[in-house]
């Protein structure tokens, strides 16, 4: 989400996933490596075999999705950023602590909202799931997850499993009960997700509307 990439400020290699921001929500799988030519060659040799490098390799029939995703990524990411800023301002006005706040400079698409209770975190995530294009009928529940000391709740009715550019939210059930909201393939969908999260909070008596 910034004008400069890590390679602009000294990084020799940049690696990442295409089911995140750069894939624009269209890449179903894949990753990328960018950087110094000699290091890219070494990476390619490691991936396939010395001497062959990136001259060979399966494309799996998804190159069109890769290129279209890269083309649309700036627009998709802009919508996700707009959704995060909307979430920050809306929940700030309701009295919740948000990180970053509605006016701070942003370095990614993630928006944290501290919901102050397990009930609040669960209601928020239920609202995000209810706004999903896939599995909107599913009710997310906290569960024990490897690597966490506390139960974690996740909402992600996405077309691509694990995509973080699609609408999602998650958080561990411990103080300050923060939900980490991100994504939305369009600004309108991100906005709908936040409104649905507020609806669930309202239904649980956690926020009031004057």
Predicted features along the sequence, with ranges:
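A short linear-motif detector with a strong N-terminal bias
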Residues: 10-13, 89-92, 157-160
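Conserved small-domain helix->loop->beta segment predominantly found in fold-type I
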Residues: 61-75, 88-152
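A general structural signal for short secondary-structure boundary/capping elements
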Residues: 42-43, 61-64, 77-81, 125, ...
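Conserved PLP-enzyme active-site core in the AAT-like
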Residues: 1-78, 82, 95-99, 187-210
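PLP-dependent enzyme catalytic core of the Aspartate aminotransferase-like
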Residues: 150-210
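Short, basic, helix/turn surface patches
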Residues: 21-27, 42-49, 126-133, 163-173
């Amino acid at each position: 989400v910034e004008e400069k990439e890590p390679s602009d400020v000294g990084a020799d290699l940049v690696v990442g996933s295409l089911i995140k921001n750069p894939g624009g929500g269209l890449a179903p799988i894949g990753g990328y490596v960018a950087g110094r030519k000699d290091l890219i060659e070494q990476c390619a040799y490691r991936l396939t075999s010395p001497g062959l490098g990136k001259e060979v390799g399966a494309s799996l029939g998804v190159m069109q999705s890769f290129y279209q995703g890269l083309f649309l990524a700036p627009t998709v990411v802009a919508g996700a950023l707009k959704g995060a800023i909307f979430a920050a301002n809306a929940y700030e006005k309701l009295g919740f602590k948000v990180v970053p706040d509605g006016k701070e400079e942003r370095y990614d698409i993630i928006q944290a909202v501290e919901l102050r209770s397990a009930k609040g975190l669960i209601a928020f995530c239920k609202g995000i799931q209810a706004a999903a294009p896939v599995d909107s009928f599913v009710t997310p529940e906290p569960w024990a997850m490897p690597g966490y000391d506390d139960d974690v709740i996740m909402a992600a009715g996405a077309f691509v499993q694990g995509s973080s550019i699609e609408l999602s939210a998650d958080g561990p059930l411990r103080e300050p009960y923060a939900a980490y909201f991100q994504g939305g393939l369009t600004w309108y969908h991100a906005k709908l997700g936040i409104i649905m999260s507020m609806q669930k909070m309202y239904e649980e008596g956690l926020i009031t509307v004057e």
